[in-house]
Amino acid sequence: DYQDSACIGTSNVYLAKKWNVTPVGTMAHEWIMCTGQGNHKHNPAYSNWYALDAWVKEYGVLNGIALTDTITTDCFLKDFQLTYSTLFSGVRHDSGDPFAWGEKLIAHYEALGIDPKRKTLLFSDSLDFARADKLRKTFKDRVTVAFGIGTYIANDTCEEPLNIVMKTTACNGMDVAKISDTPGKEMCKNEEYVDYLTRCIKWRMEHDR
């Protein structure tokens, strides 16, 4: 059913070494959380800008895939303007409606005058082969699509997979948080900080045009 598909690598570096396949991956949520929120001088609503800026300074023009949903994709797109949209080869979906997200990113590239076919949309949220194929059929003629499928492939037993997510909750003695595109997936030990971060994002979305 998937004859035109191929495995290009794994994010598990041990398996990549063992089976001599390419290690692949993207930046982590923790990178954006700590770079943007682990400094008291930074407005946390600009976390993506600080993280993207530091990433580009380190890697130049070989920047790979950017992660969009650390403090919501809408806030990410405020910072993912022409320079970063050009320098990064694509973006990764990890929460929220993947079909709505894909349409939003294609529209974003087009608004910047960038041909979406030159960019990659990497989907990685709770995928199986059938869902990945539906996404592929939806977007394949407009953009390059790729998929990160973990639990469905790795949990090949009859047992229900455990839902284990590990995220940073503090950096440099400061609270940090992830506010994704899926309501209720916030991750932080300090509810007051989550409220503060949410208000910062809301203010920016309303005032930063």
Regions found by a protein language model. Name each.
Residues T73, G96-K119, S124-R209:
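Gly/Ser/Thr/Ala-enriched C-terminal appendages of enzymes
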Residues D1-K104, H108-Y109, F139, A170-M174:
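Buried, small/hydrophobic-residue-enriched core segments of structured protein domains
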